[in-house]
Amino acid sequence: MEKSETSRDKSGGTIVLASGGTGGHLFPAQALATALEARNWNVQLFTDKRGMEWQDRFRDGSVQEISSSTLTFGRPWLLPKQASKLIAGYKECLARFKELAPKVVVGFGGYPSVPVMMAARYAGIFSMVHEQNAVAGRANRIAAGLGNAQVIASSFEPLYGFSAKQMERVRLTGNPVRKLVIDAARPYKAPRADASFNLLVFGGSQGARFFSEFMPKMVAELPKAVIRTLRVAQQCRPEDIDEVRAAYEAAGVTALCRSFFDDMPELIARSHLVVCRAGASTVAELGVIGRPAIYVPLPHSLDNDQLRNAQSMERAGGGWIMLQDDMTPQQTAAVFTRLRFDEADLTRTALAASAHGRPDAAELLANQVEELAQAGQPKETADE
């Protein structure tokens, strides 16, 4: 984010964002911070030690570390120590609220957001949560209930995990993405049968492991007519890069294999088909850029959130779901071959993905924040 003036120079008042320290939480927080600062708000981010590594993406001096801990209910002997850290974070937030006098507190999930949201309720400050996934995370469920968040901003429709009463507070905004993603969007053009076909494959650490093992085997099953024009870019674990590249070369395919792509939005825009997991940011970015994708949700994930994310896009016609446990190289190769030569289906799916995307999500979320900031004193809306 471009650096700006200090908080004393801002005239709109202060908004506090609270986020866990992972990209899935921090990307939308960063996008909202950009939108709010453009509207003359002073934005402060409260996060944990991991989130402090993102300081260079926010305005100088606007990121503050608070005490926090994940609650591991499966190991109850650790809970007292973990709870004490959350209580310490709660007290830290109350002290900082007295100094900052925020108009609104916005939680983006992750346990570091919990003490911030609880402190907002105690201090009588308006609050809202933004849920990135189609299934509410634990921290946001706590924030919406015990934290008494007045607004629940959702990225997907339908949204699962909240009570019927809490659902009355839901507002569909979409999941804010980085400006780099918005700038990468351009019309999709399916390639002719004799033109190069760009396949992009990526996932998180577990996705990278599975795709590194599976995708070269799938490609080896493809007809020569498909292999001849196929170009692959794939995210791999560092220890897998050489082996994956060699497997593709043995199949006659040119492959760019890296552990990290710093130009991922541009790679997505250049792709004709994407094979990926279905994390919230991934689905949001593919929608904004408008590219057809085969989604392979992370199996056995908590609450099946990735499956629900992918189902939202599939219902909109913007992609296809394949379940990892059911996939075989032969069956997947048959699906891929059909799509490779079906320009109409690829184009139709790309358009549907784009229609499902929300490039204005950050602005819609900023609108919700400002509506709260302009309202009166918070009312108790927690479940009875």
Segments predicted by a language model, with ranges:
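A short, well-ordered alpha-helix in the C-terminal region of glycosyltransferases
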Residues: D345-P359
